């Protein structure tokens, strides 16, 4: 073996020979800084626990969704469009996409309280998440909601339990009876919206759907003629309103 080849073999062997690990070379444990300790865990949101689940991709304005009128206090035109799209999707029981639309509205106008109300509406079957979103709406009442929007948010506060499955007094109650009482309070609060805004057909539509849902846990529909009258008022103003679902 010539000298040049011997040198190459020696270098090759040294490269693969296990090197001793000195104490000072060992990886030191990462010290947790104040900044890192405040960061959310992977997959979690800076905005709060309720945002950890649900849609991740941004919403888009979908064509041919129909149209409704739901004025809000936002000055952002696209936020307004996403609010109305979210309500259209609520009427169609398209809850995931509805939450996505309301989330997009909140991204465009973070202080818009009614956007968080919409997220709560889209999660009525998940009281913990609904309460998280509703608390976000309530925290923005003074600066992010007009009088009418405040009525919607305060009405929903009657329906969503304050601390789902944690209130000891509620545990002693019959769950169905508790839901019935909350639904009755919600319907009463929604009717107050119509007292002040008698032309608000979205309030009428939401009352109708809540009456239908609440009937399952004991809130009796005492007059189907009254329900039909509400629907007729809705369709008289908007024949294509999604309440026909």
Regions found by a protein language model. Name each.
Residues 19-22:
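Sec/Tat signal peptide C-region and signal peptidase I cleavage site
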Residues 6-17:
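Bacterial N-terminal signal peptides
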């Amino acid at each position: 073996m010539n000298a040049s080849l011997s040198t190459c073999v020696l270098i090759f062997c040294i490269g693969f020979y296990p090197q001793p690990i000195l104490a000072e070379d060992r990886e030191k444990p990462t010290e947790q800084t104040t900044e890192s300790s405040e960061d959310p865990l992977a997959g979690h949101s800076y905005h709060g626990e309720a945002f950890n689940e649900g849609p991740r991709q941004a919403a888009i304005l979908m064509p041919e969704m129909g149209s409704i009128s739901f004025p809000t206090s936002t000055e952002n035109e696209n936020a307004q469009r996403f609010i109305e799209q979210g309500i259209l999707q609520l009427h169609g029981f398209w809850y995931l996409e509805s939450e996505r639309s309301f989330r997009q509205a909140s991204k465009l106008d973070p202080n818009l309280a009614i956007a968080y109300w919409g997220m709560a509406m889209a999660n009525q079957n998940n009281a913990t998440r609904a309460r998280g979103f509703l608390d976000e709406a309530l925290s923005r009442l003074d600066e992010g909601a007009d009088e009418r929007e405040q009525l919607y948010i305060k009405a929903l506060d009657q329906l969503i339990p304050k601390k789902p499955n944690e209130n000891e007094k509620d545990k002693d109650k019959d769950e169905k009876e508790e839901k019935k009482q909350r639904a009755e309070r919600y319907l009463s609060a929604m009717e107050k919206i119509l007292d002040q805004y008698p032309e608000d057909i979205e309030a009428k539509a939401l009352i109708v759907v809540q009456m239908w849902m609440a009937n399952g846990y004991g809130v009796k529909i005492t007059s189907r003629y009254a329900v039909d009258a509400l629907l007729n008022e809705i369709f008289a103003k908007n024949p294509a309103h999604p309440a026909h679902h």
